[in-house]
Each structure stands twice: as structure tokens, then as C-alpha cells.
């Protein structure tokens, strides 16, 4: 049985749209970073927990995100250039890391810049200072710490390393 070509095209478009809709939105402009930030990251998933190191480097109008395992082996490298993610280096695509980076951009955006950076229906701010982006929860337990809770139950606990603190 052969499906009609318009049906196949429509189905492909719907699948592509569904894949795009599941990604957290990117800001209209990235948060301003005066210098590189380095975080110790603890990722907890149903499979277990991982220790990671994350470096975020401003490079002109772009931001470079580099995620490493404890041995220094790169796990993900992406650049945010002109509002879109671009591969940085020869690593294979890492959709989980790209989603994490997108939510982290939201977490790092100053509160007063959120209305201009994100569509009103995409985010909320609670009285306790926590935020929600789509189905992700962002909490700020201390000035140098972030907690991100994913819709699937996994979580990321980030601690800013002292050398990179503003």
C-alpha cells in the first residue's frame, strides 16, 4: 500500500512541528554575561546521577556552552548565535543538553528582562522568586546556586564555581 504524497508530506510536517514544540523557547536576546561562568552540575535522572562541569562563555554576540564529564571529556558543545543553536566542534547532537542549555538561558535572564526576552504565555514567576518555563521549574536556593526540574522528573543542581562568580 502506497500513501498519497500530500499525506506523507503533511505527516512529516506534523512530526517536525511536534519536535519543535517540545523544546523550550529561546530568548529574543541572550542574557548579558560580563564574563565566563563555570558551574558544577549534578544531574539526577531515573538512571542515576552524574557530576558534570559547564562553562558558558560570551563571545561577542554569541554564547558558547561546553559541558564536560569529571575527566574533562566534552559531552556537549553548542553556540547560541543570532537566536539559534549551532554545533560547536565534532560532537554528535545532544538534544538533552541543548534543552538544558535553553532552560539555563531562561534561568540566567534577569527578572526585569523576562517580559522582553520571552513570550508572556511561555513563562511564569512565583512569589518565592522561582520561575516556570513551559513545564520546567527553576529555583534559586542561593545567589550562587540554581535548581532546574525537568518535566520528566530529572533535575539539575548547579553551583557557580568561585573563580567565575561575578
Language-model features: locations:
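Post-signal-peptide N-terminal segment of Sec-exported extracytoplasmic proteins
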Residues: 36-73
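Short Gly/aromatic-enriched secondary-structure transition segments
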Residues: 76-83
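Bacterial N-terminal signal peptides that target proteins for export
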Residues: 1-11
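Mature, soluble, non-transmembrane domains
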Residues: 21-24, 40-42, 49, 73, ...
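Bacterial Sec signal peptide processing site at the extreme N-terminus
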Residues: 14, 19-35
